[in-house]
């Protein structure tokens, strides 16, 4: 969608679909240095989220995967079934700002093994008091797992550092 919207600027704009952490490598390979500006689409693609096989949605019986790229090895199922209660709690709190992270982590460990997204969602929905009726009580847990699995914050941090290196003066 973004690419189509920016088509009229193709002389001044290059559309690249890649992980943020590759920005410097791509700029050097494409020989458009120095860059005068960089635009990042930080939103999550609904095309990826809607793929049932990835387990991003808590509304479907889908494997607990949550990887954006199948080249990654760690899945949500791995995290939920092998990490300690403390590690899971930390992930939920740090990446999802989940206030009930300890209780959810305890429930996860007590209900192992987990294989499907709807299983995890049901455990949370049936045991966690809902404080915000506008969002599903599983939302923050799924967000936290997705961010952790895909190293989204690490990628963004690397990207920002590299962006400063490839931006020209006044960029």
What feature does the model see in each segment?
Residues 1-171:
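S-adenosyl-L-methionine-dependent methyltransferase catalytic core, i.e., the SAM/SAH-binding region
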């Amino acid at each position: 969608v973004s690419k189509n919207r920016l088509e009229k600027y193709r002389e001044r704009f290059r559309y690249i679909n890649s992980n943020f952490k590759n920005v410097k490598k791509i700029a050097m390979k494409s020989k458009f240095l120095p860059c005068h500006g960089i635009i990042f689409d930080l939103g999550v693609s609904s095309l990826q989220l809607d793929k049932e096989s990835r387990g991003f949605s808590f509304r479907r019986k889908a494997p607990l995967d949550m990887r954006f790229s199948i080249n990654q090895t760690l899945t949500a199922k791995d995290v939920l079934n092998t990490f300690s209660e403390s590690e899971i709690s930390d992930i939920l709190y740090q990446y999802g700002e989940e206030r009930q992270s300890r209780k959810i982590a305890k429930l996860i460990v007590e209900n192992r093994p987990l294989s499907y997204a709807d299983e995890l969602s049901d455990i949370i929905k049936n045991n966690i008091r809902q404080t915000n009726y506008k969002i599903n009580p599983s939302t923050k847990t799924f967000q936290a797992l997705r961010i952790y699995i895909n190293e989204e914050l690490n990628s963004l941090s690397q990207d920002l550092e590299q962006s400063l290196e490839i931006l020209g003066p006044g960029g």
